[in-house]
């Protein structure tokens, strides 16, 4: 779909509606694996669907990112051809990808679908050595077991302006990688992996923040950096003010995915934080909303992208909650025709999304 309709920005919508929701649900202490052992009955509801469907699809996207588009397509075609008009199980599905890619897909997928939760990859740099360690990510602390074979894709930025990519499979609890003289390293390039990343040295995050500001990173990566950082805020490991400081790198951000995510995080903080947090979130949210609305327009434009309309709806609603006088004036003006005799479709004038 992305190939034929790139204007739909379908992968941004997938990450926001599927991957992000699955990460949030799977970060709770009480979660469960994608595949329930022994064929145990499971009711599909708002608690289980983000794991079975959203996490399941996201883990498939992780495999696609690790073995590549071509191998993924060939594996899928081979699987469908071999089992046409017949029955097959998930193991045969993984074997199809393993055959065409020569990668241990079955080993990876068994660990990812049979155990609950997902990993947090901690990143510590010492000179030219990157030490990675993994643990289960949860918002609340706990003593959890689990180890995942993590398909890692690293993007390295060298001092001469060149870039390098590395793909490694992290099978154990720790892994050391020689990154040479790289100035910055982005773990989980393209945000294909279903895991959180935490850069323990703020200097390493700052180096990536420069790439955010200069647009050297994709919209998916710009989303992932701040999303993972906010997850650590929610877990109590990072202060909210540190998150706000990192958002300064997004001062000129105009892409749907990072913007709608940042606004959502600020709205969450504004909703449940203490007085100081609420005020700081309102100031930041108001500045972002007013800047972006001035850029994309307060009214829908002919033939504009769906994601632009969705972004406007969310920002208009939240800008009013943040105390934006400009948004309040616009909302009042748009409401007047509706409140009297003129028949105006709210979705065309001031359509507001939910909180």
Regions found by a protein language model. Give the residues of each.
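Hydrophobic alpha-helical and helix-loop surface patches within well-folded domains
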Residues: 1-143, 268, 272, 276-295
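Long, ordered, helix-rich scaffold segments
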Residues: 20-21, 27, 49-50, 56, ...
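Structured loops at beta-to-helix junctions and adjacent beta-edge loops in soluble globular domains
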Residues: 37, 63, 133-135, 155-157, ...
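Solvent-exposed, flexible loop/coil residues
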Residues: 38, 89, 172, 198-201, ...
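Residue-level detector of functionally special positions within alpha-helical transmembrane segments
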Residues: 68, 171-173, 188, 344
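Generic structural signal for hydrophobic residues
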Residues: 93, 150-152, 315
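Beta-strand-rich binding/interaction modules
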Residues: 105-106, 118-186
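Residue-level detector of conserved catalytic or cofactor/ligand-binding positions
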Residues: 338, 342-354
